[in-house]
């Protein structure tokens, strides 16, 4: 897996905080499930006031279909900041960029440029559309690095559940042309330098998974 140690160290710290905030709900059958990353925990207003936000930035187009991201960065720092693509979970079939908004805001408050992204879900487009969109998001950030004050050589990704799978695949498929897609900025690399995949599905071949 691609790894830049300084970015990964900070991302791991945020992953620990993220997991601590995922409180468990009791279920009648004894099951438990985490709360959404956009659940009841609030980002303090003073933290939000220190962030610059660009919402609904279009990063890819497929005919009349546009994909958007919400970009956050600290107001008191500009230029050559590491960037993080924040990918939402939802079983590849539901969710949106707002479900990772607080993770993106919390990371931005710690000195990153963050991009919480939408991507095509399985009801709209089959695999590999999801990962192609994630790669298009990375290429967009790299292509617009000067505008958003990003270090193009230090881009990472974070995701939980289905997004953990996409983040891991993003980190390990930089040289797989079939997964690049046609989301634009083809002259830029989709490689990332750090990744924190949390609880992602990685075994798609076992009998249990197929069932």
Where are these regions (language model features)?
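N-terminal cap/lid segment of alpha/beta-hydrolase-fold proteins
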Residues: 32-79
């Amino acid at each position: 897996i691609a790894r830049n140690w300084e970015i990964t160290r900070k991302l791991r710290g945020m992953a620990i905080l993220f997991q601590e905030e995922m409180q468990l709900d009791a279920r009648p059958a004894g099951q438990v499930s985490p709360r959404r990353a956009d659940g009841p925990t609030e980002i303090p207003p003073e933290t939000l006031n220190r962030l610059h936000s660009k919402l609904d930035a279009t990063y890819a187009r497929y005919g009349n279909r546009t994909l958007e991201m919400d970009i956050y960065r600290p107001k008191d720092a500009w230029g050559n900041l590491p960037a993080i693509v924040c990918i939402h979970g939802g079983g590849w079939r539901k969710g949106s960029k707002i479900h990772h908004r607080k993770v993106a805001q919390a990371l931005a408050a710690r000195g990153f440029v963050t991009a919480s992204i939408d991507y095509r879900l399985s009801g709209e487009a089959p695999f590999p559309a999801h990962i192609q969109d994630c790669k298009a998001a990375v290429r967009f950030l790299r292509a617009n690095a000067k505008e958003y004050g990003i270090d193009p050589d230090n881009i990472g990704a974070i995701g939980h559940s289905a997004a953990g799978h996409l983040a891991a695949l993003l980190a390990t498929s930089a040289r797989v042309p079939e997964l690049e897609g046609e989301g634009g900025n083809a002259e830029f690399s989709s490689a990332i330098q750090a990744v924190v995949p949390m609880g992602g599905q990685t075994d798609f071949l076992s009998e249990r998974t197929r069932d």
